[in-house]
Amino acid sequence: DALDKLRFESNKGTDIADKELPLEIKIGFDDKKNTITISDTGIGVTRDEMIANIGTIAKSGSEEFLKQLSENKEAVNNIIGRFGIGFYSVFMVAKEVIIKTKSYKKDEVAVEWKSDGLGDYEISDIDGEINRGTTIEIFLKDETKEFSEKYRLESIIKKHSNFISFPIYLENEKINTISAIWREPKSNLKKEQYDEF
């Protein structure tokens, strides 16, 4: 969504920070430290947007959200898609999350948000230059360390994100290689594409 939003702003003629950056998603992992890092070159967010969307939910307590999620999945599913709410499901597998982001708006300061998901968070300005977009570093719980293994991440990406129109790289290897054939005219499709789909 962040990349689509940036493309939309660019098509409108908006003056965008770091406009030379390719639109892409990069995923890294460290199976020794049990971390996953997800970065995009999308629209990013401002400090105010971070507080309004992620911070407000933190104040109300992601611990309560996770409790509701485990007790009554149907009721919670109605709000999962809202910005911020779905993000908090990361704390089902993470003991800490750090978000670093810089808005596409040229004069905005980059910010860092940090939380253990228990209701409090820290937000601070980032000194130095970082590129437009967002990086999320996930510190996994010991019992969920399998998600920091390459084969597991690759499997998840291929299952849930194979048809994303932007490239997704896992440790510099493009993972989403199947094009969304439903977007192509039938006359342009090859039998191999159809069979692979």
Residue ranges and their predicted role:
Residues 1-142, 146-147, 155:
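GHKL (Bergerat-fold) ATPase N-terminal catalytic module, capturing the glycine-rich phosphate-binding loop
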